[in-house]
């Protein structure tokens, strides 16, 4: 009986985390912007992009630039 309560409690916690929208699903198929930038050959920089590179997107939830 305790096992069923423990499983129900765990399920409720899991669903409440998913409903809050705190990027819980990032590891379940959605790729972060940092991963996509590096995978496409770019660099994530907080400062301006170096000469001869262009901004291709953002990194770290829009806090940095993806330079390529």
From Swiss-Prot:
Gene coding for it: DEFB1
Swiss-Prot/TrEMBL keywords: Antibiotic, Antimicrobial, Defensin, Disulfide bond, Membrane, Secreted, Signal
Protein name: Beta-defensin 1
An MF annotation (GO) of this entry: identical protein binding
Domain of life: Eukaryota
Prodomain residues: 22-32
UniProt family annotation: Belongs to the beta-defensin family.
Subcellular location: Secreted; Membrane
Purpose of the protein: Has bactericidal activity. May act as a ligand for C-C chemokine receptor CCR6. Positively regulates the sperm motility and bactericidal activity in a CCR6-dependent manner. Binds to CCR6 and triggers Ca2+ mobilization in the sperm which is important for its motility.
Keyword Secreted tagged: yes
Pfam families: Defensin_beta (PF00711)
GO cellular component assignments: extracellular space; membrane; microvesicle; sperm midpiece
Keyword set includes Signal: yes
Region forming the signal peptide: 1-21
Disulfide-bonded cysteines: 37-66, 44-59, 49-67
Subunit structure: Monomer. Homodimer.
GO terms for biological process, alphabetical: calcium-mediated signaling; defense response to Gram-negative bacterium; defense response to Gram-positive bacterium; innate immune response; innate immune response in mucosa; positive regulation of flagellated sperm motility involved in capacitation; response to bacterium
């Amino acid at each position: 009986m305790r096992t069923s309560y423990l499983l129900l409690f765990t399920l409720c916690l899991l669903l409440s985390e998913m409903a809050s929208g705190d990027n819980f699903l990032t590891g379940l198929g959605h790729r972060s912007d940092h991963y996509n930038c590096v995978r496409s050959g770019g660099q994530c920089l907080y400062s301006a992009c170096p000469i001869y590179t262009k901004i291709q997107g953002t990194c770290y939830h829009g806090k940095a630039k993806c330079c390529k």
